[in-house]
Amino acid sequence: MIELYYWTTPNGHKITIFLEEAGLPYKIVPVNIGAGEQFDPFFLSFSPNNRIPAIRDLAPADGGTPLGVFESGAILEYLAEKAQKFLPAAPRAKYEVLQWLYWQMGGLGPMAGQNHHFVQYAPERIPYAMERYVKETNRLYGVLNKQLEGRDYIAGDYSIADMACYPWIVPYERQQQKLEDFPALMAWFERMAARPAVVRAYEKAAEVNTAATMTPEAKTILFGQTAR
């Protein structure tokens, strides 16, 4: 059994997509990041960066005590190795997947995240920051579009690279992007959206009540942190 400590963010969606695709038994444990639940001492014991998602594998392969993993990319790798799915064993194919997973972790996610912040949430409009991150998001869409030309999925076969990237493309309109400008990306996006496991993952998200996440108090919690 996997305990998934989760909130309805792109990084959270990555893990529900994997778990639904792989058919691993799991339980969602909501962590309301707008209410500060990510600072609970128990959660911090296995997610020291106070971010979701994180998991606890209650039946790890070594037979030991529950194993905690934080950072969505590390979680995807861990689960792929556990399930022996969606991450090839052959080195060339494996690293084709991993380089795109890390591209998402180091590029698409952080840049689109800053896009969201300055376009949607910042208390003041800063034109330079907005333009900077909207343009960089656009550039990254172009990189992904080129990679997808002539193939159904990012690394050829469906993999954790697709699961990592898709949730960050879902809010493309909020990122001020037009999918029609990226035909290969748009075809992949539609292909992903039609997968039954992806549909189920987003249905699970809809069951989590996030109505009060972005209150003024929540924004202070989310965007006003310093070292603890």
Where on the chain are the PLM-derived regions?
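Short secondary-structure boundary/hinge segments and terminal tails
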Residues: 36-37, 190, 209-211
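GST-like fold's C-terminal all-alpha helical module
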Residues: 104-196, 203
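Generic structural signal for individual residues within well-ordered alpha-helical segments
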Residues: 44, 95-98, 164, 186, ...
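Short beta-strand edge/turn micro-motifs at domain boundaries
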Residues: 19, 197-198
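Acidic/histidine-enriched, glycine/proline-rich intrinsically disordered or flexible terminal extensions
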Residues: 205-228
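GST-like domain detector, emphasizing the conserved glutathione-binding G-site
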Residues: 1-131, 135, 145, 219
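Alpha-helix/helix-capping structural signal
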Residues: 74, 196-197
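Short, solvent-exposed turn/loop segments enriched in Gly/Ser/Thr/Pro and often Arg
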Residues: 32, 160, 205-208
